[in-house]
């Protein structure tokens, strides 16, 4: 057995590394002495849990003062000891539990269903204490960031960076590849590994007293993490043939437009300076500037030049737009899907159900939240399972209905109760002397204001997004405030709360909410936006909890803000989508937040116009 000693917050801690099967008896003694609760972590060959060559190398268990590192890579005896420990201990604390629990299931055949009920996740707890990221003036939620603030800054700066240091010291090794290449008993590697469960055990001691929310919220946030881990495990079937053809088509398109741009003297369409030089040589005057003072050539300018420029300028601007788009789509999305799919041709997204200041969910791997809205080409890459159809169920004006429910504005509530056109109602309030229909431009301006109010936007935002002058923009904003006076009153109450406390508290409804959202007193107007965004997230989150309880989780693929995507058996697709919609619907106070179920064909893209 190898022993490493280190200091954490003034205390000596010991890390014991199992070397031989004889050492496992000492590990078992340690487990028997701590059956109540332990820190837990794993070290693996990388982050690609579902790739064929993925392995778990070590599993670590620890108290605030002692850790044991078991090298499961050495074979069945070591794996068996860890499996027995995972089953025997009654409670564990991990940081980002979803990853490690998927590792244990994938490599040690320990079902997540048996592990989640006895897990506490310090990443979830840290978010409930302070939901802001480091870039927002908060503490952050990574293990390194939380340890730096709550436990020991020196350990965070020196120990949690050890693997990056190891990679830097080795020729041809990167931070991504060091995990599979480092020697199993490298002392630096063992120190890094053994420290994690010790830090998790210490972190929960610091965080637990600081979490000022209901226990039910803590439990349900863990349940949400559990549900999302099951969706990650399930994966989303990739149409490999279509995706490979799309990759080739995009490559040809990118090459063609690069050639067109080159004929105008632009070697790199991703170089703003080169594009700007060519445009100016054609007589285009570039007025916009970036914060650093460089010429600004963005999509708005290029799109305008395509429509209004001379034939040559239009052709060049189109080549830049289309060439960059083809390159981005291929490299960022299509080729990534092909590269990261598992042996069953399934892509496994990473779903974080508790993200951002407002707790909005985020998805990486399959970037459903950032794909071009309304476009089917990329979405066509993904399929429902064999014998299934794709179903999408989204909420009807989720954020506006949440705004109506929380403000209890009589006119807005009645508009939803009577199924009126809210945007038309706002437009007519802004221009009472005009004859306005659903096709009038005023309705479009009013729609911008309705959603802009949710996001904290005023007349300036409306003017920028609609092209109205400030006087007209102010007119439509004033029309909104006259039509729905309680919204303005709610916003003012929230601003006072934010200035007084430094935060607002969201409403606690059916097990979720009641969280504190920090608000910068200088930007107190953002409080309404935070409230609506966070409360809307909780609507979708409560839907996931109900769907899970009803047994629908195996059919769910992705939660996308106000939409849930599912693969449902073709023979029962209409019923399945309708039932999912019924379970998602929520009566929030006086307002029903209803849903629109839709069944497509085999591909996700079919919901956006694709034939298959």
Predicted regions and their residues:
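Short hydrophobic/aromatic beta-strand micro-patches
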Residues: 465, 565-569
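Conserved short beta-strand edge segments in small beta-sheet-based binding/regulatory domains
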Residues: 587-599
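Conserved "right-hand" nucleotidyltransferase catalytic core of DNA-directed polymerases
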Residues: 1-25, 32, 37, 42-44, ...
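Short alpha-helical scaffolding segments that buttress acidic/His motifs in well-ordered protein cores
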Residues: 123, 147, 189, 224-231, ...
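Short amphipathic alpha-helices in soluble, non-transmembrane regions
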Residues: 576-584
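Helix N-cap motif at beta-to-alpha junctions
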Residues: 470, 569-574
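Conserved catalytic core of nucleic-acid polymerases
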Residues: 284-286, 307-310, 348, 353-356, ...
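Active-site-proximal helix-loop-helix substrate-binding element of RNase H-like nuclease domains
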Residues: 2-19, 48, 52-208, 296, ...
């Amino acid at each position: 057995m190898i022993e490493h000693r280190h200091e954490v917050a003034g205390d000596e801690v010991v890390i014991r590394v199992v070397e031989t099967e004889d050492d496992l008896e000492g590990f078992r003694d340690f487990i028997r002495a701590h059956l109540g609760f332990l820190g837990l972590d794993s070290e693996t060959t990388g982050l690609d849990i579902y790739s064929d060559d993925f392995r778990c190398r070590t599993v670590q268990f620890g108290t605030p003062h002692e850790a044991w590192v078991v090298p499961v890579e050495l074979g069945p005896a070591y794996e068996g000891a860890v499996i027995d420990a995972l089953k025997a201990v009654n409670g564990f604390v991990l940081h980002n539990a979803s990853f490690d629990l998927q590792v244990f299931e994938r490599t040690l055949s320990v079902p997540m269903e048996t592990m989640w009920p006895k897990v506490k996740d310090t990443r979830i707890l840290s978010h409930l204490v302070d939901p802001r990221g480091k870039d927002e003036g908060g503490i952050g939620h990574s293990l390194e960031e939380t340890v730096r603030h709550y436990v020991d800054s020196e350990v965070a700066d020196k120990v949690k960076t050890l693997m990056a240091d190891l990679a830097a010291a080795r020729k041809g090794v990167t931070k991504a590849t060091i995990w599979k290449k480092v020697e199993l008993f490298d002392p630096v590697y063992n120190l890094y590994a053994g420290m994690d469960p010790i830090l998790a055990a210490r972190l929960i001691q610091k965080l637990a007293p600081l979490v000022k929310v209901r226990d039910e919220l803590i439990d349900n946030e863990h349940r949400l993490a559990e549900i999302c881990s099951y969706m990650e495990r399930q994966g989303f079937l990739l149409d490999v043939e279509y995706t490979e053809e799309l990759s080739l088509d995009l490559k040809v398109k990118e090459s063609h437009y690069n050639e067109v741009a080159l004929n105008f003297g632009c070697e790199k369409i991703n170089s703003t300076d080169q594009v700007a030089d060519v445009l100016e040589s054609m007589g285009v005057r570039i007025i916009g500037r970036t914060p650093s003072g460089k010429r600004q050539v963005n999509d708005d300018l290029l799109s305008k030049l395509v429509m209004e420029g001379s034939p040559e300028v239009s052709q060049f601007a189109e080549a830049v737009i289309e060439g960059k788009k083809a390159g981005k789509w291929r490299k960022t999305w299509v080729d990534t899907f092909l590269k990261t799919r598992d042996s069953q041709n399934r892509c496994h997204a990473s779903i974080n159900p508790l993200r951002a200041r407002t707790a909005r969910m985020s998805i990486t791997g399959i970037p459903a939240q950032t794909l071009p809205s309304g476009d089917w080409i990329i979405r066509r890459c993904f399929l429902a399972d064999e014998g299934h159809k794709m179903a999408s169920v989204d909420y009807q004006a989720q954020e506006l209905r949440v705004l109506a429910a929380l403000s209890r504005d009589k006119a807005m509530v009645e508009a939803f109760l009577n199924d009126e056109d809210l945007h038309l109602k706002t437009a007519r309030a802004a221009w009472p002397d005009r004859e306005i229909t659903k096709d009038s431009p005023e309705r479009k301006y009013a729609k911008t204001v309705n959603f802009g109010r949710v996001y904290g936007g005023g007349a300036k935002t409306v003017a920028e997004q609609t092209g109205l002058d400030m006087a007209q923009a102010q007119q439509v904003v004033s029309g909104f405030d006259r039509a729905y006076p309680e919204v303005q009153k709610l916003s003012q109450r929230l601003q006072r709360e934010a200035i007084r406390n430094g935060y607002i508290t969201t409403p606690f409804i059916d097990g979720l909410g009641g969280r504190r959202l920090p608000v910068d007193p200088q930007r107190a107007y953002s409080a309404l936006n935070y409230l609506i965004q966070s409360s809307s997230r909780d609507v979708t989150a409560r839907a996931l909890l109900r769907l899970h309880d009803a047994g629908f989780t195996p059919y769910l693929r992705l939660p996308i803000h106000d939409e849930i995507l599912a693969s449902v058996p073709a023979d029962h697709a209409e019923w399945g989508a309708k039932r999912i919609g019924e379970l998602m619907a929520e009566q929030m106070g006086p307002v029903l937040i209803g849903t629109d179920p839709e069944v497509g064909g085999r591909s996700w893209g079919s919901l956006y116009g694709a034939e298959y």
